[in-house]
Swiss-Prot record:
The keyword Repressor does not apply. The keyword Aminoacyl-tRNA synthetase applies. Transmembrane segments: none annotated. This is Histidine--tRNA ligase. Belongs to the class-II aminoacyl-tRNA synthetase family. InterPro entries: aa-tRNA-synth_II, aa-tRNA-synth_II/BPL/LPL, Anticodon-bd, Anticodon-bd_dom_sf, His-tRNA-ligase, HisRS-like_core, HisRS/HisZ. It catalyses: tRNA(His) + L-histidine + ATP = L-histidyl-tRNA(His) + AMP + diphosphate + H(+). Its EC number is 6.1.1.21. One of its GO terms (molecular function) is histidine-tRNA ligase activity. Keywords: Aminoacyl-tRNA synthetase, ATP-binding, Cytoplasm, Ligase, Nucleotide-binding, Protein biosynthesis.
């Protein structure tokens, strides 16, 4: 007896780890947020540019963890010409390639902004995704401290444009030269210690997440996390670890009455590391930057020097900065959430120079759009309600052309509208359920009787949803029920829909 053919197995629909789907409400919120950021960046004179998601791997450089495989830390593949290409892990390295390739045609300094998705081939976890959105601005071709100061000021202005009040954010400023000076002083300067220094910097960069004890472990032999995974440390000796921790413990703010950046920098110069020329040069850079920001009206409540700011990427060469949210809020389950850093950047004078073989100074700032959006949504600065859907024109019978004409008329008037394209035999109730799921403000109804009379029925779906709460108040219920559906002549349809949308505060962004 012949075997029955096996039924083909259904493919399992599943989302890859570390990635997320996004619906209309979240996309609309992103659009609103990006527009506010764009307005600030353009006010500062930056212009847009786009680069592709893929770059040659060697163009991106090994600025994420240096591993044996070229696709460690980034998503990479070999092209048909056997060259490695990778998905960008940030928006800065691709910009460096773009500027180098178009150097002679671009104005210098070159001021640009761009936003888009970036990708990290890292272990995903709560709040850590493999794909996320960034919004960057960069000035290439200027080594002036004013360019770095401008990034800090623009970061502060952007936070306020997004509805985050002063006192609820802080732009923190440091200098890689200060950290490099400390590392030189403890004996790990020079090219032969590049990898070890990078491990130290990345350990310090995790201070807000792991605390001093976790950083100490990463400065030493290493640290095992809650899942049991072991991260190899920098292998510093006890004395070297003590010196690094001394710097991190020295905030310089505890006994300062006026909260002065100048006073803090004076205190830093009192540390024994100040005899190091690199350390001293870093202090002088910060003095110039803070002089500019303070003269422009940005006090220490908005921009403040902080020696714990590192930035984890290797390519930074000078001033570095981060934007921290000082908001304590709760997630949807009532658990406390502290968002910390939502953006940062710094000076990267060597990134474009790799392609040019000549010095090309550059500085930039990046906002983590995905992370900041989550924070703004939780504090109520970004709506998470779905945007109003289109006006739905319902259908009766097989004649579609007349209904489609109504849709076209609404669209020509600038009203979002769609024809119900489900089963034409569906009842009016089924079509209304569809309109509700689409979050439609109203629906247009025209059966055979209405068609003969040259009228349409307009059903106010927003008011209809409110009627459910009025069932106990019969008089009010009957009054609003009469308002929830009304008729008008066909040639009055557009005007009546516009009145309803205005009355209900419906505006499509």
């Amino acid at each position: 007896m012949a075997e029955k053919p096996k039924k083909p197995q259904k493919l399992r629909a599943r989302l890859p780890r570390g990635l997320a789907d996004r619906g209309p409400a979240e996309i609309a919120a992103t659009r609103a947020m990006v527009e506010k950021i764009r307005e600030v960046y353009e006010r500062y004179g930056f212009e847009p540019v786009e680069t592709p998601a893929f770059e040659y791997t060697d163009a991106l450089g090994k600025f994420l963890p240096d591993q044996d495989r070229p696709n460690e830390g980034v998503f990479s593949l070999q092209d048909d010409d056997e060259q490695w290409i990778s998905l960008r892990y940030d928006l800065t390295a691709p910009l460096a390639r773009y500027v180098a390739e178009n150097f002679d045609q671009l104005p210098k300094p070159y001021r640009s902004y761009r936003f888009g998705w970036v990708f990290r081939n890292e272990k995903p976890g709560p709040g850590r995704f493999r794909q996320f959105m960034q919004f960057d601005a960069d000035t290439v071709g200027s080594g002036s401290p004013a360019a770095d100061a401008e990034m800090c000021m623009m970061a502060a202005d952007t936070m306020e444009a997004l509805g985050i009040p002063r006192g609820s954010y802080l732009v923190k400023l440091n200098n890689r030269k200060i950290l490099d000076g400390v590392l030189e002083a403890i004996g790990i300067g020079g090219d032969e210690h590049i990898k070890q220094r990078l491990v130290v910097l990345r350990a310090i960069d995790k201070l807000d997440r792991l605390g001093l004890q976790g950083v100490e472990q990463l400065l030493g032999e290493g640290r095992k996390d809650e899942s049991g995974d072991f991260t190899r440390g920098a292998s510093l000796n006890a004395g070297q670890i003590r010196d690094v921790i001394t710097l991190l413990n020295f905030a310089g703010w505890g006994d300062i009455v006026d909260g002065s950046n100048t006073h803090t920098l004076d205190e830093w110069e009192g540390l024994r590391f100040s005899v190091n020329s690199t350390f001293s040069a870093g202090i002088q850079d910060l003095r110039q930057i803070t002089k500019i920001t303070e003269a422009s009206g940005y006090d220490t409540g908005r921009i403040r020097v902080d020696n714990t700011v590192v930035r984890g990427l290797e390519y930074y060469t000078g001033p570095v900065f981060e934007v921290e949210l000082l908001l304590d809020t709760k997630d949807e389950k009532g658990r406390p959430v502290r968002f910390g850093s939502v953006g940062g950047g710094g000076r990267y004078d060597g990134l474009v120079s790799r392609f040019r073989g000549e010095p090309v100074p550059a500085t930039g700032f990046s906002i983590g759009v995905s992370r900041l959006q989550a924070a703004l949504t939780l504090i109520g600065q970004l709506g998470n309600k779905p945007q109003a859907g289109p006006v739905v024109v319902t259908v009766f019978g097989g004649e579609i052309a007349g209904y489609q004409k109504m849709v076209a008329t609404l669209r020509k008037a600038g009203i979002r509208a769609e024809l119900y394209l489900g089963n034409p035999k569906h009842s009016l109730g089924q079509q209304m359920k569809y309109a509700d799921k689409r979050n439609s403000p109203c629906a247009i109804i025209q059966g055979s009787d209405e068609k003969q009379q040259g009228i349409v029925q307009i059903k106010d779906l927003i008011l209809g949803a409110e009627l459910a709460s009025l069932e106990k108040d019969r008089d009010e219920y009957l009054k609003k029920q009469a308002e929830a559906q009304f008729s008008c002549k066909e040639d009055e349809m557009v005007a009546k829909v516009q009145e309803l949308l205005q009355r209900r505060g419906v505006a499509w962004g």
